[in-house]
Amino acid sequence: MRPESLVTDHTIYACVMGSRAFGLATEGSDTDRRGVFLAPTPLFWRFEKPPTHVEGPADEQFSWELERFCELALRGNPNILECLHSPLVEYADATGRELLALRDAFLFRGVHETFVRYAHGRRRKLDADVRTHGAPRWKHAMHLLRLLMTARDLLRTGALTIDVGDRREELLEVRRGEVPWPEAEARMNRLVREAEEAAARSPLPQEPDRRRVEDFLTRTRRASALRAA
């Protein structure tokens, strides 16, 4: 089976991510599509296993096999967790809807470390841009601020909301370069501190609910095998 066929024929969940999902789209913004496919169980009985992810077949499209998606989500991967909370769902079959119903099972206090570590990587790139070019890439600075806001609010409330809502304009001001870098930098530092404070008393559980996720994955694999019998 061609990798593209796994996406076209076996997708269980598809959504739009990026600026459009974050409420930060402007004229000319790309449409970034993300999805989850369920590789038929018999494909795992071969020496050559199905891929864990597939790029395409459309432009700006990327999909994960369900098991890999769940593994990354259980580790608190920011990109994966945000996919499960996109406000722009394009498709979800019965299995995809069950995955969405499980999304809170992936949230735990460890997201503080994974989100902030991811943010630190982006921050280093911005600092390098400032040293080399005298200014950051403002679009990247905007998205870093958004990510830190999301992490802080998740730790405070226990709920992951990725649409920036009424913070849109203040973030777009950063994208347009209307906020001096020292001020943007100060906002980032403040958000990191606030996320750390929120982590100490977060309503999130200490660990994700691996048992629920594993039960879902096992039942899904079994059902796929029975359909192929």
Predicted regions and their residues:
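An N-terminal structural lobe/cap that precedes and organizes the functional/catalytic core
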Residues: 1-94, 101
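Amphipathic alpha-helical interaction segments
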Residues: 52-53, 72, 123-126, 224
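Conserved nucleotidyltransferase catalytic core and NTase-mimicking acidic/glycine-rich helix/loop elements
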Residues: 91-214
